[in-house]
Amino acid sequence: MAGHSKWANIQHRKGRQDEKRGKIWTKLIKEITVAAKMGGGDLTANPRLRLAIDKAKDANMPNDNVQRAIQRGTGSLEGVNYEEIRYEGYGMNGAAIIVDCLTDNRTRTVAEVRHAFNKNGGNMGTEGSVAFLFKHCGQMLFAPGTSEDQLMEVALDAGAEDVITHDDGSLEVLTPVPDFSKVQDAISQAGLKAELATVAMRPETEIALEGDQAESMQKLLDALENLDDVQEVFTNAAL
């Protein structure tokens, strides 16, 4: 990741998401509904739901919206049945892309995802074509200036797999998915605040893109993220 600012990339991504807040709320409501349906409405027993609600709070979503989404998931209110689907593909210079969706119409979703790839210079791949290039893990990012020694001690004691110091001074904590909430709680109780905390498909290595390639790749990623059925887009491209 040398030469690329993890911190700048995250801040840029958050800024773009803030511009699309209404769409972000819609995606979060779907995630909360599915999480509650799969694991119940108890946050202490449902880490996926807790993470979705944390993201909703970060996006300033009203609590009434959150509660209605939970009730739709648990069956207290009538709701739509969503299916989880993952698509894989390629962008510029063979960079890998994973597209995670929640949909009530698989035919519509695959057509829209394929169109976004084709229109913006990418290609859809087959199942498993790029997933092996990523690791499913908990991921937390901390601003430059965060105490490395303190974060490392707290995180590793709580069960984190690794604490990475990036060239820009930001710190990244990686956890096994089942231990994400436990590590997050320990870090929070130590008075340290993550700027990003999520469960993600993290690339094992990154492909550096610059100039026109980076611009084209960003356009492709934006097109995919803007689709209503798309929840998350992951890539191994460093832009």
Swiss-Prot record:
A GO MF label: DNA binding
Entry superkingdom: Bacteria
Keywords: Cytoplasm, DNA-binding, Transcription, Transcription regulation
Record region (Disordered): 1-21
GO cellular component, one term: cytosol
Regions annotated as coiled coil: none
GO biological process: regulation of DNA-templated transcription
Localization (cell): Cytoplasm
Protein family: Belongs to the TACO1 family.
Annotated HAMAP family: Transcrip_reg_TACO1
Name of the protein: Probable transcriptional regulatory protein Pnuc_0618
Organism of derivation: Polynucleobacter asymbioticus (strain DSM 18221 / CIP 109841 / QLW-P1DMWA-1)
Taxonomic lineage: Bacteria, Pseudomonadati, Pseudomonadota, Betaproteobacteria, Burkholderiales
